[in-house]
Amino acid sequence: MSACQTPLIVALDFPTREAALKLADQLDPALCRVKVGKELFTSSASGIVETLCDKGFEVFLDLKFHDIPNTTAMAVKAAAEMGVWMVNVHCSGGLRMMAACREELAKRSGPQPLLIGVTVLTSMEREDLAGIGLDVDPQEQVLRLAALAEKAGMDGLVCSALEAPALKAAHPSLQLVTPGIRPAGSAQDDQRRILTPRQALDAGSDYLVIGRPISQAADPAQALAAVVAEIRG
């Protein structure tokens, strides 16, 4: 496997295996990792992860597990057995759920994926949180959940780049994975709390998830190269 030399993760947000692999075949595993989300995984099952690993990619399995502690821990174990590089769970599942996942991975003798917590989805603003009974700003809720994640022994968090400076200050050991990244001039789509790749890294993000600006580009390889050039300055 080619070791990835950048913090970039390209989201394979496609409905079919064929479409996802068509994009993957245009990308260099040395320049990016790839993310498999709910739609692609549901339509393609675990075979898509195996195929991407065989192509040399490190895979972020973005299924945001959220269930009772044992069920979630067993799902994380299954992901590890697939060979994924990163897997995530919802921090809102609570301390016991996250700790159960950490404990299950610690039993493994082989490589362990990075265990990442999802704080507040980047599409959510204060009024969205109020609608589910949380009368707080997104950043305040992120910090609450981050404290739980660190206590549970998580490796990092998914968060908006706008929350990254405060998170790095409060929890410097946590690795920050940031979606909602849009190169300069890109449309915002449905991601609200966004920054450019360079801005996100400067804010403290460790990994950057980029979707449509690369996946929907006329030349995805060229679009990826442009983002790499941007972050390398």
Curated annotation (Swiss-Prot):
Catalyses which reaction(s): orotidine 5'-phosphate + H(+) = UMP + CO2
MF (Gene Ontology): orotidine-5'-phosphate decarboxylase activity
Pathway: Pyrimidine metabolism; UMP biosynthesis via de novo pathway; UMP from orotate: step 2/2
Pfam families associated with the record: OMPdecase (PF00215)
Entry-linked SUPFAM superfamilies: Ribulose-phoshate binding barrel
Keyword Lyase among record annotations: yes
Residues forming the catalytic site: K64 (proton donor)
GO BP, one annotated term: 'de novo' pyrimidine nucleobase biosynthetic process
GO CC list: cytosol
SMART domains: OMPdecase
UniProt-recorded name of the protein: Orotidine 5'-phosphate decarboxylase
Organism name: Pseudomonas putida (strain ATCC 47054 / DSM 6125 / CFBP 8728 / NCIMB 11950 / KT2440)
UniProt lineage: Bacteria, Pseudomonadati, Pseudomonadota, Gammaproteobacteria, Pseudomonadales
